Swiss-Prot record:
Regions crossing the membrane: none
UniProt lineage: Archaea, Methanobacteriati, Methanobacteriota, Thermococci, Thermococcales
Protein name: UPF0212 protein TSIB_1358
Family: Belongs to the UPF0212 family.
Signal peptide: none
Length: 130
């Protein structure tokens, strides 16, 4: 049995927004409200980052077209006593999925930790790290 830090990524669609900053604020608020409703206040909510295909520099994953925004969100939580990496992934998706129904969740990263220190297994589905 192991303890893991699991980072999930989720695309959040928001409506009636004017700018990327507005979309980010609404998306974070929407996700935090859904998590708090299910008493999941231990899940950390952060803005996702994308990489510019031209220059390679990272930027916040928020796009607005016609007052509709798409925001990439990272959700981080600790999973205790999981039997394996895959088990930790399933637990994290089940816990967060309970609050964010109909939102596709994908594992961004999983790290095993012992005694509060991260070590060992790491899975990063992105080819470019920031």
């Amino acid at each position: 049995m192991g303890d893991y830090i699991v980072v999930l990524e989720a695309p959040i669609i928001v409506r009636e927004v004017e700018s990327a900053d507005d979309a980010i604020n609404v998306a974070v608020s929407k996700v935090a409200k859904a998590l708090n409703k299910e008493k999941l206040d231990f899940v950390r909510v952060e803005i996702g980052y994308s990489q510019c295909p031209v220059c390679g520099s990272p930027f916040e994953s928020a796009f607005v077209i016609g007052n509709v925004g798409l925001v990439g969100i990272y959700l981080t939580l600790k999973v205790f006593n999981a039997q394996s990496l895959e088990h930790a992934e399933r637990i994290a998706k089940a816990v967060v999925g309970k609050a964010l129904k109909k939102v596709p969740l994908k594992v961004f990263e999983i790290k095993e930790f012992h005694d509060g220190k991260e070590e060992g297994i790491e899975l990063n589905n992105h080819k470019n790290e920031f």
